[in-house]
Every structure is written in C-alpha cells, then in structure tokens.
Swiss-Prot record:
UniProt function note: Involved in oxygen transport from the lung to the various peripheral tissues.
Gene3D superfamilies assigned: Globins
GO annotation terms (biological process): hydrogen peroxide catabolic process
The protein's name in its UniProt record: Hemoglobin subunit beta
Phosphoserine: residues carrying this PTM: 44
Coiled-coil spans in chain: none
Protein family (similarity comment): Belongs to the globin family.
Keyword Chaperone tagged: no
One annotated Gene Ontology cellular component of this protein: haptoglobin-hemoglobin complex
PANTHER family associated with the record: HEMOGLOBIN FAMILY MEMBER, HEMOGLOBIN SUBUNIT BETA
GO molecular function, one term: haptoglobin binding
Post-translational modification N6-acetyllysine, affected residues: 59, 82, 144
Length: 146
C-alpha cells in the first residue's frame, strides 16, 4: 500500500486513539449482523440469533480483538502486507474456505466503526488513508486464493 507521509501520520494519530477491544468486537459483530451469511464461519460462537445476541457475544468480541490486533500489526508492515498476512491468508483459504469478498466487507465495516468511534477526528483524509489500508489488507488476505 502506497501512502504519503501525511497519510501515514494521519493513520498513526488516529490509530493511537482506537480501543482494540471495543472496535474489533463491534466491527466483527456488525459484519455478522449486516451480512448474516458470514455467520456460517462462526458456528462455535454460540448464540448469533439476533443483533443483540451477536453484539453481546463474548466470543465475537474476543475474535474481533484478534482481528484488530492483526490489522494493527499490518499497519506496522504496510510495505509487506502480503508477507504479513500470508499465514492468515493460507488459513482462511485452505482450511476455513472463507470467501475472499468477506475481507473487503469487513474492511468497509471497520471503516464505518472507526468513523463512529473517532467522530470529528475521522476526517476525509483519515478515511481515505484507512480505505487504502483495508483494501490492501483484504488483497493480502485474498492472496492465497489466486
């Protein structure tokens, strides 16, 4: 992902204000509610029968934090996203058989959740930078599918 120095600074500043526990769980929860077919990958998570159940599910919150921690690691390796996400790409492709389109959907949901949490600090410039990164991460996660 190619980012200008200004975009990198905007990302770094914004990301420093993100609570991974809250944002990760909310992003994954929203994905599961808005795109219910994605729930089939989370059979072991228990009750996903309603939006309230999904958003309050401790396994959704815990896995959302793991997802956000991986994303955070990706922010440290923007010049090598494919390498950074190679093992996760292999897992999601070969073992879990996740449709790679779901990575793009999760990235878009994450941007919405970040906007909600960052409020006025989520400027158009910050949004543009995050959109580039989530697209790059989605492509890296889909890499083993090609």
């Amino acid at each position: 992902v190619h980012l200008t120095d200004g975009e990198k600074n905007a990302l770094s500043t914004a990301w420093g204000k993100v609570n991974a526990d809250e944002v990760g769980g909310e992003a994954l929860g929203r994905l599961l509610v808005v795109y219910p077919w994605t729930q089939r990958f989370f059979d072991s998570f228990g009750d996903l029968s309603s939006a309230t159940a999904v958003m309050g599910n401790p396994k959704v919150k815990a896995h959302g934090k793991k997802v956000l921690d991986s994303f955070s690691n990706g922010l440290k390796h923007l010049d090598n996203l494919k390498g950074t996400f190679a093992s996760l790409s292999e897992l999601h492709c070969d073992k879990l058989h996740v449709d790679p389109e779901n990575f793009r959907l999760l990235g878009n949901v994450l941007v919405v959740v970040l906007a909600h949490h960052l409020g006025k600090e989520f400027t158009p410039q910050v949004q543009a930078a995050f959109q580039k990164v989530v697209a790059g991460v989605a492509n890296a996660l889909a890499h083993k599918y090609h």
